[in-house]
Amino acid sequence: MNRTFDRKAYRQELIDAGFSAEDAETIASRTVMRAPRETFQSVGSMVQQATAKIERDSVQLAPPALPAPSAAVERSRRLEQEAAGLAKSMTIDTRGTMTTKKRKTAGEDLAKQVSEAKQAALLKHTKQQIKEMQLSLFDIAPWPDTMRAMPNDTARSALFTTRNKKIPREALQNKVIFHVNKDVKITYTGVELRADDDELVWQQVLEYAKRTPIGEPITFTFYELCQDLGWSINGRYYTKAEECLSRLQATAMGFTSDRVGHLESVSLLHRFRVLDRGKKTSRCQVLIDEEIVVLFAGDHYTKFIWEKYRKLSPTARRMFDYFSSHREPYPLKLETFRLMCGSDSTRVKKWREQVGEACEELRGSGLVEHAWVNDDLVHCKR
């Protein structure tokens, strides 16, 4: 149900939530501009309305009711049942049994198709609404400038690995990426991404893009990027930053989950290029993939203090990715964590020691109260 939008009250709620007065004023003002004059409709309510509409439309996808069977059909079915009963007593398989199974399978397939159609329509409708209202990532998943954010579904996956720097990156073709949650399936095509650099660059680019309407490009310099990452300001790190941006652009990720449905081909960066290369006015231009934003929707993302997070080692950072994506962190098996890190470590004792060191590092960073290994489980207290 629509309600009158109180800008001052909304601004105060944002300030109470930890945003600066300036950011709160910006969000509240933009919300007033994008909402109708007398009412405000949230993204969540749009999705609910879209779902209701699709529920109504999906009725048309259901098969029409079958007419009542004729006397001839009834007689045929009765004979089939009698034959099936006789065959059962003689331990003989029947076509009738197979036909029943086929009917059941066909019904399940149809239900699956209807469900997929509803999810696809909902996704399309939601993306259209976001574009029409010129919403930004910040409108959907706000976080303070001192923090960074990432979707929970990427935080719990092996999309960014902790493999040794000396080992060349793999070129992957439609590879299934390990995910802690069984209902989530990710396939990836592109050069292997590492937590050491690619993960940090992607998170910083999302920070640059968060206040720009989705679908519009953003620009920044290599100097700004390296400075915000805490990297040295020189040609070597400028080259490293450009290589990361190129890898993030040359990706195709298929994503399927019960919550989101199916995303066919998502790139972590939709487009990247260098403007005025070689000149003092040179800048990077990046466009964020619109479908990435869907992974943030519904408060399914985690945010963290950037100054502490970016200084963690890759293993400690991946550990924090997992634990921070849960309100109440569940213990994680050592082997599950190894798979989530994409680690090549084959010696259990060595991996246990490495994880123990990461726990100490994470505890020392102040991002968590306590982290430790007990038996074959990694524990965390936020």
Curated annotation (Swiss-Prot):
Listed InterPro entries: TrfA
Region (Hydrophobic region (HR)): 286-297
Protein name per the record: Plasmid replication initiator protein TrfA
Known function: Required for initiation of plasmid DNA replication, along with host-derived DnaA and other host proteins. Both forms of the protein are capable of initiating plasmid replication in a number of Gram-negative bacteria. Binds to 8 17-base pair repeat sequences (iterons) in the RK2 minimal replication origin (oriV), opening the origin of replication. oriV opening does not absolutely require the presence of nucleotides; formation of open complex is somewhat enhanced by ATP or ATP gamma S, while DnaA or HU is required for full opening. Also involved in plasmid copy number control, promoting intermolecular coupling of protein bound iterons at oriV, which inhibits replication initiation.
Keyword terms of this UniProt record: Cell inner membrane, Cell membrane, DNA replication, DNA-binding, Membrane, Plasmid, Plasmid copy control
Topology versus the membrane: Peripheral membrane protein
Source organism: Escherichia coli
Molecular function (Gene Ontology), one example: DNA binding
Primary localisation category: membrane
Gene from which this protein is expressed: trfA
